[in-house]
């Protein structure tokens, strides 16, 4: 599907951070059924995985906001990393079934949620630009990892 700016987007997690910023740039609708492109942005347990499968059944173009958190070995229980890893695997499975789905595995994005993290962070605007780059690609992009 060739991207054009008039396409309708359904974005989860629009109250703050990246999801909120994306709504400033993209034409949005209030539900999955009406959209052309689903941006799966809100982390809420395993719900991102469930929404990914729902969007795939509706033949939507999908961008999942993942994390580089599943990378590496954790020395303590880290459910967030497990949930984001499940999103990675579901994306991979559906991609190879022909679904136009991509997972963007960001490192820290400079939002209030991670204001106390003392690590390098990318700007929200830069993260938006990464998503726009994916949208403009003429071919499917399976995954992309971006760390500051």
Spans of features found by a protein language model:
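Conserved Rossmann-fold SDR core element
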Residues: 95-109, 140-143
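Short acidic low-complexity segments
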Residues: 27-36
């Amino acid at each position: 599907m060739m991207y054009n700016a008039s396409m309708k987007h359904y974005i989860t997690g629009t109250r703050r951070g990246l999801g909120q910023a994306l709504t400033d740039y993209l034409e949005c609708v209030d539900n999955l059924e009406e959209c052309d492109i689903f941006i799966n942005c809100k982390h809420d347990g395993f719900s991102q995985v469930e929404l990914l499968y729902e969007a795939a059944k509706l033949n939507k173009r999908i961008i999942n906001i993942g994390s580089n958190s599943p990378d590496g070995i954790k020395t303590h229980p880290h459910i967030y990393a497990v949930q984001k890893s499940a999103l990675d695997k579901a994306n991979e499975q559906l991609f190879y079934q022909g679904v136009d789905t991509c997972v963007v595995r960001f490192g820290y994005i400079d939002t209030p949620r991670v204001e106390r993290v003392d690590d390098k962070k990318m700007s929200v605007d830069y993260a938006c630009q990464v998503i726009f780059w994916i949208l403009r690609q003429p071919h499917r992009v399976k995954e992309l990892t971006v760390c500051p």
